UniProtKB/Swiss-Prot annotation:
Function, in words: Peptide chain release factor 1 directs the termination of translation in response to the peptide chain termination codons UAG and UAA.
Biased composition (Basic and acidic residues): 284-296
Protein name, UniProt field: Peptide chain release factor 1
N5-methylglutamine modifications at: 237
Keywords from the UniProt entry: Cytoplasm, Methylation, Protein biosynthesis
Organism: Shewanella piezotolerans (strain WP3 / JCM 13877)
Gene for this chain: prfA
Protein biosynthesis in keyword set: yes
InterPro entries: PCRF (IPR005139), Pep_chain_release_fac_I (IPR000352), Pep_chain_release_fac_I_sf (IPR045853), Prokaryotic/Mito_RF (IPR050057), RF-1 (IPR004373)
Post-translational modification comment from the UniProt entry: Methylated by PrmC. Methylation increases the termination efficiency of RF1.
Subcellular location(s) of the protein: Cytoplasm
Region (Disordered): 284-305
MF annotations from Gene Ontology: translation release factor activity, codon specific
Pfam families assigned: PCRF, RF-1
Taxonomic lineage from the root: Bacteria, Pseudomonadati, Pseudomonadota, Gammaproteobacteria, Alteromonadales
Length: 361
């Protein structure tokens, strides 16, 4: 491993010890905000420090094995050769692991997120598929012990949703789900299709990180148009008799957010403002990214909403992830929330892309 990388890792190890000492300081414990920030930093350093300590131990084991190999005893020599080989393999594995752990982190990866699913081309079938996608993400959230909270729904006439917005809360939510942004296409025979013909329809998924209040962009109240209206209850849902639903328009950007799934206007307004803040931040981030990436495009996109990223083919039981040319014949399990089979390769591809870019640099 390069000396510059070793020096960086030694600096992180030192910082980890500093943070640990600070966390037991009475003054820090009394200052909740500072304590929270240091706890978060300690947690972020944990994996890289653990891997580096294992790396240092493996290097010591390698040196010990080298010395033992100089012994005259044949049995001891053979044992030393085995230890040398094992230590060398451990070092190689940990070098790769540490390279990935040192890659620049997306500061939003640990945040909660908002997921917006909208039916596109395909009418009723697109709305039904939007409902299927929402169920898939709900199952995935459940398997990760994340909390999911519906914020707004616009139901389809024959089931599913024309639009659904939900907040997903938990550890590392945005880092996992951000790659779901884009166009999702479905090919299947609708239940109403008597000829058995396969129809194609589409949905758009947008995943935005929740922006903590302290980091949120300041929104000028004069830039907002706020409308209240009566929530449209469906089927077995309650129908509000008061104007508790909220529609907020951010005039400078034209972004419109509606929230009506809470019974109180106050709660709907608070939720609408947090979604609005996330959307405005996303517009700003996109602007900055396009300036930074004008010379280079990432292999894996995590934000191009117009790009078709995945096809779900029901007659063939196939899911195709177009960004990394991955095809899997396990659509049933996938729709039940087993989506790590695609998310993990997408994360790995992104890491490989970043490592290649660092190599070029």
């Amino acid at each position: 491993m390069k000396d510059s990388v070793i020096r960086k890792l030694e600096g992180l190890l030192e910082r980890n010890e500093e943070v640990l000492a600070l966390l037991s300081d009475a003054g820090i414990i009394a200052d909740q905000e500072r304590f929270r920030a240091l706890s978060k930093e300690y947690s972020q350093l944990e994996d890289v420090v653990k891997a580096f300590k294992s790396f240092q131990q493996a290097e010591e084991d390698l040196e010990s094995a080298k010395e033992m190999m100089e012994e005259d005893d044949a049995e001891l020599k053979e044992m030393a050769q085995e230890e040398y080989k094992a230590a060398k393999e451990t070092i190689e594995t940990l070098e790769s692991e540490l390279q990935i752990l040192l890659l620049p982190k997306d500061p939003n990866d640990d945040n909660n997120c908002f997921i917006e699913i909208r039916a596109g081309a395909g009418g009723d079938e697109a709305a039904i598929f939007a409902g299927d996608l929402f169920r898939m993400y709900s199952k995935y959230a459940e398997s990760n012990r994340w909390q999911i909270e519906v914020m707004n729904t616009n139901e389809g006439e024959h089931g599913g949703f024309k639009e659904v917005i939900a907040k997903i809360s938990g550890e590392g939510v945005y880092g996992k789900l951000k790659f779901e942004s884009g166009g999702h296409r479905v090919q299947r025979v609708p239940e109403t299709e008597s000829q058995g013909r396969v129809h194609t329809s589409a949905c758009t998924v947008i995943v935005l990180p929740e922006i903590p209040e302290a980091e949120a962009i300041e929104i000028n109240k004069a830039d907002l148009k706020v409308d209240t209206f009566r929530a449209s209850g469906a089927g077995g849902q309650h129908v509000n008799k008061t104007d508790s639903a909220i529609r907020i328009t951010h005039i400078p950007t034209g972004i419109v957010v509606e929230c009506q799934d809470q019974r109180s206007q106050h709660k709907n307004r608070a939720q609408a403002m947090s979604v609005l803040s996330a959307r405005i931040q996303a517009v700003e981030d996109e602007k900055r990214r396009s300036e930074e990436d004008s010379t280079r495009r990432n292999l894996v996109s995590s934000g191009d909403r117009s790009e078709r990223i995945r096809t779900y083919n029901f007659p063939q039981g196939r899911v195709s992830e177009h960004r990394i040319n991955l095809t899997l014949y396990r659509l049933g399990e996938f729709m039940e929330g087993d989506i790590d089979v695609v998310i993990e390769p997408l994360i790995q591809e992104t890491q490989a892309d970043m490592l290649a870019a660092l190599g070029e640099g």
